[in-house]
Amino acid sequence: MAKTPTRKKSKKVIIDGIAHIHATFNNTIVMITDRHGNAICWSASGGSGFRGSRKSTPFAAQVTAGSCGEKALAFGMKNLEVRVKGPGPGRDSAIRGLNAQGLKIQSITDVTPIPHNGCRPSKKRRV
C-alpha cells in the first residue's frame, strides 16, 4: 500500500494580540488571542502547579502569565494589548509576568463588568 504524502503543518505567525487576564479571588486565568478574538494559548494558576489557596496569590499569577507568554512567543507574537477583568490579587503581577517574557505591552485596559444596580449582591460575610 502506497503512502499518501502528508502535508507539513504550517505554523501561524501572529505578531499582534490581546492578552485577557481574568483575576478572581480564587484563581487567575490568562488567555492570549489574536486581534479577531481567536484563542492562541491560555494558562491558569492550577495548570501551573498551584493548588488550593496558593492559586490566588500574585506569584501564581506571575508564573501563569509567564508560561502563557512563552507559548505566545512560539507563535511569533511581539506586541500585546492587555485587558484585565476582575478584582483578584493577581491583576498587576500577571502584567509583570507578560512583560518579563519580552512582549511589548501597548495598552492596558480594565474591562471589569460593573453593574448599574443589576442583581442583588450576596449577603455580607460574618466571620
UniProtKB/Swiss-Prot annotation:
Tell me where the signal peptide lies.
none
GO MF annotations in UniProt: rRNA binding; structural constituent of ribosome
The record's section on SUPFAM superfamilies has: Translational machinery components
InterPro entries annotated for this entry?
Ribosomal_uS11, Ribosomal_uS11_bac-type, Ribosomal_uS11_CS, Ribosomal_uS11_sf
A family per Pfam? Ribosomal_S11
Looking at the record's lineage, which domain of life comes first? Bacteria
Any idea which UniProt keywords this protein has? Ribonucleoprotein, Ribosomal protein, RNA-binding, rRNA-binding
Look up the record and give one Gene Ontology term from the biological process aspect: translation
Presence of keyword Iron-sulfur: no
Mind telling me which GO cellular component terms the entry cites? ribonucleoprotein complex; ribosome
Ubl conjugation as a keyword of this entry, yes or no, is no
Main role? Located on the platform of the 30S subunit, it bridges several disparate RNA helices of the 16S rRNA. Forms part of the Shine-Dalgarno cleft in the 70S ribosome.
The record's section on HAMAP family has: Ribosomal_uS11
Q: How does the record describe its quaternary structure?
A: Part of the 30S ribosomal subunit. Interacts with proteins S7 and S18. Binds to IF-3.
- Family of this protein: Belongs to the universal ribosomal protein uS11 family.
Recorded protein name is Small ribosomal subunit protein uS11
Annotated source species: Ruthia magnifica subsp. Calyptogena magnifica
Organism phylogeny: Bacteria, Pseudomonadati, Pseudomonadota, Gammaproteobacteria, Candidatus Pseudothioglobaceae
